[in-house]
UniProtKB/Swiss-Prot annotation:
InterPro entries assigned: Rbsml_uS13_C, Ribosomal_uS13, Ribosomal_uS13-like_H2TH, Ribosomal_uS13_bac-type, Ribosomal_uS13_CS
Protein name: Small ribosomal subunit protein uS13
Gene: rpsM
HAMAP family: Ribosomal_uS13
Source organism (scientific name): Burkholderia vietnamiensis (strain G4 / LMG 22486)
Key words, A-Z: Ribonucleoprotein, Ribosomal protein, RNA-binding, rRNA-binding, tRNA-binding
Length: 121
């Protein structure tokens, strides 16, 4: 298994698909990394030479990926919450922040339904 950016890339996959195992790299960025490194993206990871892997590591190093990207996203959300802007408040309350309806639906963001309380008469 090749190790790039602290992630083990599966040997049996094509380079284009294997690079997507790294957080922050999708198919498009994977293709651009392969072309910039001069590596054929249809080549299997196990068939890559050490020189190819080094070129890929160098190209991936130009982007913010894995832990740094996760930290940046978390800090961006925290900044919104500290500002007290609309999006930050919605993050804090655990509600959708992009204008979706919440009277019904929004179950993914709100979590499972709570049991209804019995009314006393």
């Amino acid at each position: 298994m090749a190790r790039i950016a602290g992630v083990n890339i599966p040997n049996h996959q094509h380079t284009e698909i294997g690079l997507t195992a790294i957080f922050g790299i999708g198919r498009t960025r994977s293709r651009s990394i392969c072309s910039a490194a001069g590596v054929e993206f249809s080549k299997k990871v196990k068939d890559l030479t050490d020189a190819d892997l080094e070129k890929l590591r160098e190209e991936v190093g130009k982007f913010i990926v894995e832990g740094d990207l996760r930290r940046e996203v978390t800090m961006n959300i925290k900044r919104l919450m500290d500002l007290g802007c609309y999006r930050g408040v919605r993050h804090r309350k655990g509600l959708p922040m992009r204008g979706q309806r919440t009277r019904t639906n929004a179950r993914t963001r709100k979590g499972p339904r709570r049991a209804a309380q019995a009314l006393k008469k």
